[in-house]
Amino acid sequence: MKAQAKKIGNGVYWIGVLDWDLRTYHGYTLDGTSYNAYLIFGDDKVALIDNAYPGKTEELMARVDDAFAQEGKTGEECKVDVIIQNHVEKDHSGVLVDIHKRYPKAPIYCTEIAVKGLKRHYPNIKEAEFITVGTGDTLELGGKTLAFLDAFLLHWPDSMFTLLVEEGILFPNDAFGQHLCYSKRFDHEIPEHVLMDATKKFYGNLIVPLSKLVLKKFEEVTELGLLEKIKMIAPSHGQIWTDPMKVIGAYSEWATGKCKDKVTIVYDTMHYSTQKMAHEIAEGIMAEGYDVEMFFLHEDERSEIVKSILDSKAIAIGAPTINDEPYPSIGDLMYYLKGLRFERTGIKRKAVTFGSMGGKGGTPASLGKDLGEYGFDVVDTCEVYYVPDEEENKACFKLGQKLVEEAKKI
């Protein structure tokens, strides 16, 4: 296979893998992704940062070979001296065994926790030389210096960031990434709204519960005097940021709960009664000047819903009752929300719940109880018998208005 490496800096190449066909990953939908890996040429050593998903060896190695060719290297000069493993997860370590077979003398630099994880994932690599590093440690490549920074739980316990000091390129692995698959590598080469939408979706589905750690890491990086040194951010998925403050600013807003005057409405329905309620609630919300994003769980999926919730001041969740319990599809979303812990963004988003019943009912109360435990401030609930009548439609409209009144207090 022939594949081209992309030069992104002085002696620095993107040598990643494009997964054009991936449609589901980490529990949400996407239109492909990239597994970004990088090759850095120093005067004395060549370093490889991260790799790709299992089965992607051929494409990654083809780009490695092309990078050596672009640097004018031939024969025995074409070798990797150092392997940097910022993160254990398989989409960034799945080619590690094949890389080590090709370059058996190259030590693997990673965190202490990563050593344990890599040996569990890849028993055949136990004999490799592992060198553990953390904040304050550096590695000289000859005219180029790699500085390491612990990134515990951003987003796994083993995670770390690597900074190429002279070029000001930060390699933060999953942080600041997006699940996008484009032939272009840089942020400014694709539509901005596409880039930021994908970044928002990535944060909402992966980083939200770590928001407090994000802010602490920004403080640490600032105190270490590293923030002003960052000229480029090269994440492990998606586009490379040539304007690093754009994504750092976005992360800061999301981590501190900065939201729009917007309500996310999510519902499912059997015979369209709950749907009618959702639409009436939406009218009440819009009458108060707030925007609405509406999601029908029969058609829409949870990762898009979570992306919307990230910058919404309030949510409205509705479902009918079946077998004395909430409609099953809503349970999937609720368990997902439980794990994301939106309250860690520093605000309690307002919420209402609603639904129809034909017997015992109780779904709105049940959903409200759960949302309260998940860090939402539940304002009110609404339940109707079978089909909402004219007065109940008016009540739903007023419920939307009430939700906005409470959201304005945030």
Swiss-Prot record:
Fe cation 1 binds at H87, E89, H155, D174. Fe cation 2 binds at D91, H92, D174, H237. It is an enzyme of class 1 (oxidoreductase). Binds 1 FMN per subunit. Its EC number is 1.5.3.22. It comes from the Archaea. Disulfide bonds: none annotated. Its cofactor is FMN; Fe cation. Pfam families: Flavodoxin_1, ODP. InterPro entries: Flavodoxin/NO_synth, Flavoprotein-like_sf, Metallo-B-lactamas, ODP_dom, RibonucZ/Hydroxyglut_hydro, Rubredoxin-O_OxRdtase. One of its GO terms (molecular function) is electron transfer activity. Optimum pH is near 7.5. 30% of maximal activity at pH 6.5 and 8.5. It catalyses: 2 reduced coenzyme F420-(gamma-L-Glu)(n) + O2 = 2 oxidized coenzyme F420-(gamma-L-Glu)(n) + 2 H2O + 2 H(+). FMN binds at residues 269-274, 321-324, 356-361. Residues 263-410 form the Flavodoxin-like domain. Keywords: Electron transport, Flavoprotein, FMN, Iron, Metal-binding, Oxidoreductase, Transport. In the N-terminal section; belongs to the zinc metallo-hydrolase group 3 family. Catalyzes the oxidation of F420H(2) with O(2). May be involved in O(2) detoxification, reducing the intracellular O(2) concentration to a level allowing growth at the expense of methane formation. Cannot use NADH or NADPH as electron donor or H(2)O(2) as electron acceptor. This is Coenzyme F420H(2) oxidase. It comes from Methanobrevibacter arboriphilus.
